[in-house]
UniProtKB/Swiss-Prot annotation:
Highest taxon listed in the record's lineage: Bacteria
Pfam family, one: IPPT
Protein name, UniProt field: tRNA dimethylallyltransferase
UniProt: substrate binding residues: T22, A23, S24, G25, K26, S27
UniProt entry keywords in alphabetical sequence: ATP-binding, Magnesium, Nucleotide-binding, Transferase, tRNA processing
Organismal lineage: Bacteria, Pseudomonadati, Pseudomonadota, Alphaproteobacteria, Rhodobacterales
InterPro entries to which the protein is assigned, alphabetical: Dimethylallyltransferase (IPR039657), IPT (IPR018022), P-loop_NTPase (IPR027417)
């Protein structure tokens, strides 16, 4: 990635956090830092935990994984539930290892949980989630404690549904659980936090080219191999590109249409990521990329 000149000082052993939008070059930067300063690369991307997705999730290649240790990549079966809470429980023991953790990904909530703490909320029972999946957004909002609802983005169904599920399953409002948040496993002050500040047009061009690169690396074959087990409700099948290629494999759309839909979905996701990073990562070191 060749951004070494822009890096801040990286003290011996200090954990490094790397956040950035999809297709911005985070994995390349993590590998560069691991090779220059030492460390183990730890995944903080929700789609890259599944063993069935390498090309479609842009998981590091076997050749890249051979250049430095990688953890929490492709270690779960397709039907495993996964959330920020699952990730936090997996990553916390790794902070006490002998190797410097280089934690890299685009899932902003993971970094917030790591550096600010996260309430230990019980897992949502499947029947409660199934009920929530059937309810329209306004019904979900109506069933949430007003104090919790006041702090939510009411247009973000995933956040609204999560708040509804917690209250329905536990009988306790989400904001009360959050008030009991324990200390963070890794306070930001103990880390070297880096966020990639990307030029929008540069990123859009990379996104446009990325889908074809995924196809060249076998993304269509990956999705075809999972077609018989496809369940759009499972987190693994919500990875961008999977629903679009499934629709193509079912004969519903052309490959060109799948490419266009996936590119649009990726741009929309990148826009949400960039907004999150600007709003929530003001104390992180900015690394300009592209442009």
């Amino acid at each position: 990635m060749a951004v070494g000149a822009a890096l801040p000082p990286i003290p011996e052993g200090a954990p490094v956090l790397i956040a950035g939008p999809t297709a911005s070059g985070k994995s390349a930067l993590a590998l560069e830092i691991a090779e220059r300063f030492g460390g183990v690369i730890v995944n903080a991307d929700a789609s890259q935990v599944y063993d069935c997705w390498r090309a479609i999730s842009a998981r590091p290649s076997p050749e890249e994984e051979a250049r430095a240790p990688h953890l929490l990549y492709g270690h779960l079966p397709y039907d495993a539930p996964y959330s920020a809470g699952h990730w936090l429980r997996e990553v916390t023991p790794l902070l006490d290892g002998t190797a410097r953790p280089i934690i890299v990904g685009g899932t902003g909530l993971y970094f917030t949980a790591l550096t600010e703490g996260m309430a230990d909320i019980p897992a949502t029972p499947p029947d409660v989630r199934a009920e929530a999946d059937t309810l329209p957004l306004d019904r979900l909002l109506a069933g949430i404690d007003p104090a919790t609802a006041a702090g939510l983005d009411r247009n973000n169904r995933a956040r609204v549904q999560r708040a509804w599920e917690v209250e329905r399953a536990t009988g306790r409002a989400l904001h009360l659980w959050q008030a009991d948040t324990p200390p963070p496993p890794l306070p930001l002050a103990r880390t070297v936090p880096l966020v990639l500040e990307v030029d929008k047009l540069w990123l859009w061009d990379r996104i446009a080219r990325r889908f074809d690169q995924m196809l060249d690396q076998g993304a269509l074959d990956e999705v075809a191999a999972m077609a018989a087990r496809y369940d759009p409700a499972l987190p693994a099948f919500k990875a961008i590109g999977v629903p679009e290629l499934m629709a193509h494999l079912r004969g519903e759309i052309t490959l060109d249409a799948a490419r266009e839909r996936a590119s649009i979905a990726t741009r929309q996701y990148a826009k949400r990521q960039r907004s999150w990073f600007r709003a929530r990562m003001g104390d992180w070191h900015r690394l300009p990329v592209g442009g």
